[in-house]
């Protein structure tokens, strides 16, 4: 069955099976002499109200405030762990190779907290490392290390460049390193700031301590159970100084003690 509707010159043919909108077939004939159809403009307004926009922006702001600090912390932690692992490997390999070349570290001279001994150690290590900058004993312009570092968990500050016997330099990977003899034994004290003078300049966040045990011929991160600053009391503990964090980072590959 078919019905024909005629409205002025508009004709639509609709069969009983054509009631779905997609099946409506409409046509019209132009009046005599007409060349086009003048249809009234159709206005469609789409948009959000000011209240809706403000609510959406508020939600975005809350989500950003929650997620962005977490993302930044995660990135910083991964970068620090990776840099410390890399620098530890560089120093261990340099010491090992230099001992093969010049003899065991204990035979390089009498270990002491003197500028001369620190420079001697550096000169023996230098051929086996990619050094970017040499600051030496005096680093008043803070080209390698900052002048002052905060202790972990707001425990105050410690001077650094004022401790003159340390011989300081930076590696191509961005880490700053200082070497210093220890007069009481054949050990060597080595400190690493994984991002040089850049902040945060906090013990246990970017500054980490090591010793080289000449008898064991091993670079030991401060914080190992037998060290003078075990990591459980000098890193993980809420009142820890940060002196023992190197061992924690290298062992667990994270910095969860900051959370």
Label each PLM-derived region with a short phrase.
Residues 29-31, 44-76:
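N-terminal single-pass transmembrane signal-anchor helix
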Residues 92-111, 131-134:
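Alpha-helix exit/C-cap motif
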Residues 70-91, 95-98, 102:
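Aliphatic-rich helix starts adjacent to a transmembrane/signal segment
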Residues 36, 109-117:
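Intrinsically disordered, low-complexity coil segments
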Residues 23, 42-43, 71, 223, ...:
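Intrinsically disordered, low-complexity segments enriched in proline/serine/threonine
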Residues 115-259:
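Intrinsically disordered, low-complexity regions enriched in Pro/Ser/Thr/Gly and acidic residues
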Residues 58, 64-74, 90, 243-259:
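Long hydrophobic alpha-helices with heptad-repeat/coiled-coil character
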Residues 1-48:
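N-terminal leader/signal peptides at the extreme start of proteins
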